[in-house]
Amino acid sequence: MAANVGSMFQYWKRFDLQQLQRELDATATVLANRQDESEQSRKRLIEQSREFKKNTPEDLRKQVAPLLKSFQGEIDALSKRSKEAEAAFLTVYKRLIDVPDPVPALDLGQQLEIKVQRLHDIETENQKLRETLEEYNKEFAEVKNQEVTIKALKEKIREYEQTLKSQAETIALEKEQKLQNDFAEKERKLQETQMSTTSKLEEAEHKLQTLQTALEKTRTELFDLKTKYDEETTAKADEIEMIMTDLERANQRAEVAQREAETLREQLSSANHSLQLASQIQKAPDVAIEVLTRSSLEVELAAKEREIAQLVEDVQRLQASLTKLRENSASQISQLEQQLNAKNSTLKQLEEKLKGQADYEDVKKELTTLKSMEFAPSEGAGTQDSTKPLEVLLLEKNRSLQSENATLRISNSDLSGSARRKGRDQPESRRPGPLPASPPPQLPRNTGEQVSNTNGTHHFSPAGLSQDFFSSNLASPSLPLASTGKFALNSLLQRQLMQSFYSKAMQEAGSTSTIFSTGPYSTNSISSPSPLQQSPDVNGMAPSPSQSESAGSISEGEEIDTAEIARQVKEQLIKHNIGQRIFGHYVLGLSQGSVSEILARPKPWNKLTVRGKEPFHKMKQFLSDEQNILALRSIQGRQRGNITTRIRASETGSDEAIKSILEQAKRELQVQKTAEPVQASSTASSGNSDDAIRSILQQARREMEAQQAALDPALKPAPLSQPDLTILNPKLLSASPMSTVSTYPPLAISLKKTPAAPEASTSALPSAPALKKEAQDAPTLDPPGSADATPGVLRPVKNELVRGSTWKDPWWNPVQPERRNLTTSEETKADETNASGKEKTGSSQPRAERSQLQGPSATAEYWKEWPNAESPYSQSSELSLTGASRSETPQNSPLPSSPIVPMAKPAKPSVPPLTPEQYEVYMYQEVDTIELTRQVKEKLAKNGICQRIFGEKVLGLSQGSVSDMLSRPKPWSKLTQKGREPFIRMQLWLNGELGQGVLPVQGQQQGPVLHSVTSLQDPLQQGCVSSESTPKTSASCSPAPESPMSSSESVKSLTELVQQPCPTIETSKEGKPPEPSDPPTSDSQPTTPLPLSGHSALSIQELVAMSPELDTYGITKRVKEVLTDNNLGQRLFGETILGLTQGSVSDLLARPKPWHKLSLKGREPFVRMQLWLNDPNNVEKLMDMKRMEKKAYMKRRHSSVSDSQPCEPPSVGIDYSQGASPQPQHQLKKPRVVLAPEEKEALKRAYQQKPYPSPKTIEELATQLNLKTSTVINWFHNYRSRIRRELFIEEIQAGSQGQAGASDSPSARSSRAAPSSEGDSCDGVEAADTEEPGGNIVATKSQGGPAEVTAAPADREEATQPAEKAKAQPLSSGTPGQDDGEDAGRSRPPPEGLADAPAPVPNLAAPAAGEDAATSATAPAMATEAPGAARAGPAERSSALPSTSAPANAPARRPSSLQSLFGLPEAAGARDNPVRKKKAANLNSIIHRLEKAASREEPIEWEF
């Protein structure tokens, strides 16, 4: 059998039935074509014979007639033979063409044979196994017989065990006794050791207390020493400055005397010359006069020479005293430093002892409180407020000295004014050397303050300038301050940078106007008339062209290697992370594109014009001095706020600075009092005391402005008033030999901290590095009220600063547009409220603003970690205010620095900048960006963090930039310095060094949550649920409220959620619905639905991830049914349940995607819908919400108050949203029209009559129902859309169900149409008719609109087909006009648009096999076909094979029986349906033509 099946299989495989069928098809086609040709040729032959008969003579015809007749008979015989052969071929062809290929069946049969053979083998194997089992049974019986012996052996074993047990018990008793004795001994020893350790502990505690007291004493001694040291250094510095000023004045007097002596000598020579002339004219009478004049001139000259000698002695004496003072101060400084080192060493020892014995933080807090407590009484203050009494005391002490100070200042100005007037008379060529840019009285009092930072920028602080510097500038009427106006900080910085570029060239060119004086003090220099006259660019303009020309003319002759210069500049820019835009703006005065072009493709020197050479001159000057690069780097850091470390301090820094200014002024006055005699009268002193106070207040004001600019640029732009022009004037000198006297900057002295390394203070703003730690600890360590309490004297100064801060600063104006948001009156009010409220809060305003999402301790730790977070771009990124507590938070009060109205848009968040150390770690490594982004994406997905939050909190980028960077990361080598920063931040974030606040944290409870579902709220995901539909406000990322459910309930419901196939939810029945009249807590509280209850184990994202596959179509259908049945709107459902807008909900319900095509974020609304459907009280809660909304609307509608806010009810019911869109309540939303049921019914009836009503019908409906015409129009539009969507979803479902259950039998192969588009199925498009399994035709046709869906589910499976898509399927051959050229037995739908088309004839039974083909072909059922039947739509092309003709049906049934016999799957036969369909169409055409040719009678006889 197997051999027979195998040989059969091989035979049929070789036979290749399909190839044979193809060959038969080709032969049949050839035969059909030949028949047509033979018919034509026969006609031609007959016509030729007729013509031959007509044209030839009769005798010839008689001769040829027998031959022609024999030919005709032969042709007839041949044609008859060919017809019989064709008929025989046709019968064979008909039988063979539909024969299924038996190869698969034979193959299956062969496999079944193999299986049967294997069954036989298994049976024999079974027999063998049975035999072996019997043998084993026998062996088992033998083993049972041996059990008796085993029992005996067990009894013996039991006896042995009992003996062993008794022996073990005796041994155990002995051992127990021994152990008890040992234990008693050990317990005794332990007690002794415990006593000794307690005594030692007491001794250690005693020692610790003594050490702590010693440490405190040493700290206080060290503190006192530092203060003494600071006072002595400042006093010495003041003395040195006084001596220097005296020395310079003496020099000036000496020079004036020399000039007067020269003038006298000239007068003497001229007098001599005139005397000689006069002697010639009249000698005798004028001899006495000449003697007299000569003697008087000589006397005057001698007096002047004596005065010069006296002045020279004074100068020498002053220089000697100066050197002696220097030596004394140096020795004192060295002694103090030795003492300081000794104290530091003892302090280190004590700290090492204390390190292992006490908690560092506690000790630190105690020491800081002790420090603050000891500082107040040491300065003479007794009240709680440590700064205010000190200021008052200092002002009282200084009030008596201010009048003397003013008179001294007037005398100084008189002296310097006379010197200026005399100096003006001299020719400019007589002045020796380049002149300093400031007059001697304006020299700094403290040489420590005149030292510029190592980066080339200067302290932007009036604390470094003497008091008379400001007052002389303010009081001197000769200074042209009024003409300068307001100036840009950019231009000041540009001048500051340009100074070092051009100063050398200026000096070489002999220019007398230096931008900055770079050399040390000159002992013989004469003061310039005015500091502003010496700097031509002081008004904020760039250096004049003459200056740059003079700078360029120096190196005009030399050849410059442009490529090398460009390479060096690029290296320096990359090394210091300086952008080309900044470099071009400040150095070259060009745009970024021009700079990039110059650096990328530098032209050779000889090809450049004069103007083209100028950038290279500037670049060379830029590279010549390291200070230029450092200055530019500080500007870059200030503009970007990234790399340079920022020093932060609270507002107490400004008070400390004012205090130090007043102390310094006091000491200076004392020094001046002792050094110089008082030359002013009492009237002058009384008249000028007010001026002195005003100058001090103005100086304090400038100090505060500088402090604000340095320490809080993100909160308030720092205005620079006109008198501050001189701050950045060429006055602060670089390091000189005299700068070694003091090593402490003044702010560091006042804050009792040693200065840090110079690299730490690269900012150009006035902040010492030592401020950093003090500022960080200030909010937690200072006593309440001490941090921000403003002294009464200084409060008007601060108010004045606030009022003056509305000027448009080009530096900070583009950075902080949102901050200038309050009026001036509000600022002053806020300042007063802050002054009183700060005593309660105990922390500074900027810090309060930043403590939003974290607690106070977390905030302090965060800002300790980021000391440089304050930058021009740092805009307090955590300003997201949450829920009900928003109105009570202190940061909601208007900021004192915001001058206009608060804007609704929140401040753009920024990230804390990176430190240089973090840059250096990764900047020069090779980082694999692809792997890094992969890890970041994994971590984001694992923690459920959306890219928007990650970009805002970690990278400082938008969501689009983050998405682009994560999907297409560039290689590390192709990234610029700025482009590498996000990847460095990603690496730091992965390492846990950055942005730890971004990870999901548990939301904090804000209020009672009434009905909630037990799944977790992830605060970070809140803004990410519907980023397309919800406005991205800060409230969307606020922490979520927690549910008051117990944890056991939560865990229980969570486990149920996980176990159920579709997640269900338990509701908390604890709360009661709130009163509908409750207004929202605050004006700005968003009307967001209540989020899911917080639980630390499971979030909604995890619920989505764990959820099994949901039927999205089924869920949306059920939701729509529930909403429609209960007359609930999609807006209410979306806002309350899904947290989406009405448009998003409508789109979601109309076109739900399959579950497997949705992302995690896209699945979330469906999970929420499923949870809502599983809630038994879902409808009631939504109805409650709807009623409350309606009540609120009615209240608003009937209330006459114009400014009343909409009273939105608090959300009741289960809320499954996290990122709900906050609705701003100050905008009244247009009320939603709710129709009554009877109105809906009337509109539905009108719709059934006319889906597209005319305007007249609409107006009639509106008047009948008492509605607006717009409402009626909208209802018709919405209803049409709804029906269209329902039809669309049902068609999709019917298509999927029909494909799943399709069988291969011809009766079940009804054509399924492709789903139409949304508009096609409704608006006047005919539906294609589909064939039911019974062969009946059900024609569904929508008349001019979407019909009411009232059919049974079986009817709903019928799909619609657009009429415009139906295309004619061309025949294989034959004329297009043939109506009968198709399969005769095939069912056809009526043509479109013909109502009276004949119904198609059901399939007839197949005729007998022996019946003649001609008679079967001429059956009446096959004669005609309805017009248009040749057309087949796209649905037919894509569907299964329709019922074919009767002869083709019989062989088509055989494979189905074979399949049922051998168990082939039904889908196997359906695979080649399209091929079979094409083949059947071709076959029908050919067979019909052959049968027609075979059955045709010869119409014309032969002529012969």
From Swiss-Prot:
Q: Where is this cross-link: Glycyl lysine isopeptide (Lys-Gly) (interchain with G-Cter in SUMO2)?
A: 772, 798, 829, 1268
Biased region (Acidic residues) positions are 1320-1332
Q: Where is the composition biased (Low complexity)?
A: 525-555, 759-770, 1034-1050, 1080-1093, 1302-1317, 1395-1457
Compositional bias per record (Basic and acidic residues), positions renumbered to this chain: 817-841, 1354-1367
Pfam families in the record = CUT (PF02376), CUX1_N (PF25398), Homeodomain (PF00046)
Q: What are the record keywords, sorted?
A: Coiled coil, Developmental protein, DNA-binding, Homeobox, Isopeptide bond, Nucleus, Phosphoprotein, Repeat, Repressor, Transcription, Transcription regulation, Ubl conjugation
Q: Where is the composition biased (Pro residues)?
A: 433-443
SUPFAM superfamilies (UniProt xref)? Homeodomain-like (SSF46689), lambda repressor-like DNA-binding domains (SSF47413)
Which cell locations does it reside in?
Nucleus
Q: Does the keyword DNA-binding apply?
A: yes
Site positions (Cleavage) are: 734-742
Q: Can you tell me where the transmembrane regions are?
A: none
The PTM entry states: Phosphorylated by PKA. As cells progress into S phase, a fraction of CUX1 molecules is proteolytically processed into N-terminally truncated proteins of 110 kDa by CTSL. Cell cycle-dependent processing of CUX1 serves to generate a CDP/Cux p110 with distinct DNA binding and transcriptional properties.
Task: Decide whether keyword DNA-binding is in the record.
Answer: yes
Q: Which residues form a coiled coil?
A: 67-359
Q: Which GO terms describe its molecular function?
A: chromatin binding; DNA binding; DNA-binding transcription factor activity, RNA polymerase II-specific; protein-macromolecule adaptor activity; RNA polymerase II cis-regulatory region sequence-specific DNA binding; RNA polymerase II transcription regulatory region sequence-specific DNA binding; sequence-specific DNA binding; sequence-specific double-stranded DNA binding
Q: Which family does it belong to?
A: Belongs to the CUT homeobox family.
Q: What's the subunit arrangement here? A: Interacts with BANP. Interacts with SATB1 (via DNA-binding domains); the interaction inhibits the attachment of both proteins to DNA.
Q: Explain the purpose of this protein.
A: Transcription factor involved in the control of neuronal differentiation in the brain. Regulates dendrite development and branching, and dendritic spine formation in cortical layers II-III. Also involved in the control of synaptogenesis. In addition, it has probably a broad role in mammalian development as a repressor of developmentally regulated gene expression. May act by preventing binding of positively-activing CCAAT factors to promoters. Component of nf-munr repressor; binds to the matrix attachment regions (MARs) (5' and 3') of the immunoglobulin heavy chain enhancer.
Spell out the protein name for this chain. Answer: Homeobox protein cut-like 1
- Species of the source: Rattus norvegicus
